[in-house]
Curated annotation (Swiss-Prot):
It comes from Bos taurus. Residues 54-78 are annotated as: Disordered. This is Uncharacterized protein C12orf50 homolog. GO terms for biological process: poly(A)+ mRNA export from nucleus. It holds the Pfam family zf-CCCH_3.
Length: 375
């Protein structure tokens, strides 16, 4: 009924210059219409009534609601299909890898994998977080090791040559006390004597190797020299400092039993070149060393008297001592003189030091001091 009523009403857009443009316009049209090349005749009531009775819906109304449904349903299915394909491909690749691993495995590869696992396990134990129980156990082990080291230091049995705490095993305890001087400040000494003796902790074995003489003779002489040093400790100004509970060997101060300096360069060279003469010199003067003071103070006094009593212009410039050298220790002044290369002034030293003797008979001995211009 509504459709019939609408068909009786004329269309409003027909009065407009463009006319009605709607294809599915329900209102009555008295004029024909041309819409995008489609010709539509004027509407009649009979045709409209038949169409309404048959129940044929207009094509535009039925097609429009179906299109959005199709557009919505299409994008939902595609991603599902793609996902299933990827999963299947991954499963196939995994199966192929398993099959290849079963075929390619050899006993060598299996052993390598086991070794790698063991290494990883050990490294994990090393780098893992330590619990307080582990720390306490490690401390107990460290304390046991320290106690064992202290016992070995007290006994002195496990000490070897080359360590910083070496003790010469050939000497007795009394001789060790004479040789080893402990220092409380624990600071290293950089004396000239350490460099002259070749450095190191135990200079006596090093001097034996350097001279290349019999060890028994040197040891006997060193024993007597150490005994004389212990008796004349005030002269050397170095006292042995030993604790009652002495653990280990501490650093020692150097006691230099040999003369540090020589007034003549020829005397230094002769003594360095003839070690056997040096040993004979020590043998002849054993008793005098024990009675008199140490070599150092005797030679210092002799050098001071020589430097004070020497004529200012009578001695050559390379062998003289200036006034500034009176308060200082005498220093070596090496020269390239052909007369002073292999000789020394023996008679002058015999007068000044009564217990000094010549080193060898083959060397020339000048009885008189040489003057400037003398041959």
């Amino acid at each position: 009924m509504e459709m019939q009523q609408n068909c009786s009403i004329s269309c409003f857009w027909e009065t407009q210059p463009l006319g009605c443009v709607k294809i599915s316009c329900i209102f009555y049209h008295s004029k024909p219409r041309n819409i995008n090349g489609l010709f539509l005749p004027p509407s009649s009531n009979i045709i409209l009534q038949k169409e309404t009775q048959e129940g044929i819906p207009p094509p535009t109304q039925s097609q429009e609601p179906l299109k959005p449904q199709e557009n919505i349903s299409r994008p939902i299915h595609h991603p599902l299909v793609l996902k299933t394909n990827f999963e299947e491909e991954e499963e196939e690749e995994g199966e192929q890898n398993d099959a290849s691993s079963l075929w390619t495995k050899t006993p060598e590869e299996i052993e390598e994998k086991r070794a790698i696992k063991e290494m990883c396990y050990k490294s994990g134990e090393y780098y893992r977080v330590h619990t307080p129980s582990d720390i306490s156990s490690s401390k107990s082990i460290a304390s046991i090791v320290e106690k064992e080291i202290e016992k070995s230091l007290e006994s002195g049995s496990e000490l070897q040559e080359g360590d910083g705490l070496t003790v010469p095993t050939k000497f007795s305890l009394f001789e060790r006390q004479g040789e080893i001087k402990a220092s409380l400040d624990r600071k290293p000494r950089t004396d000239i004597a350490a460099f002259e003796n070749g450095g190191g902790d135990c200079y006596v074995p090093q001097r034996i190797i350097f001279l290349g003489v019999d060890e028994n003779e040197v040891l006997t002489e060193e024993k007597e020299s150490t005994i004389s040093k212990c008796s004349n400790a005030k002269v050397n100004d170095v006292h042995p400092v030993m604790k009652p509970h002495f653990k280990g060997v501490k650093k020692r101060k150097w006691i230099y039993d040999e003369p540090k300096n020589f007034p003549e360069p020829g005397m230094q060279r002769v003594q360095a070149s003839n070690p056997k003469n040096k040993m004979s010199y020590h043998r002849n003067n054993k008793n005098k060393n024990s009675e008199n003071a140490s070599y150092i103070h005797v030679q210092r006094d002799a050098v001071r008297t020589v430097s004070l009593n020497a004529p200012p212009h009578g001695r050559p410039p390379h062998g003289s001592y200036n006034k500034a050298d009176v308060n200082k220790e005498p220093k070596f002044k090496l020269c390239s003189d052909k007369y002073m290369s292999t000789s020394y002034n023996g008679s002058a030293w015999q007068k000044r030091i009564p217990f000094s003797k010549t080193y060898s008979k083959n060397e020339k001995i000048y009885t008189e001091p040489r003057r400037n211009g003398s041959k």
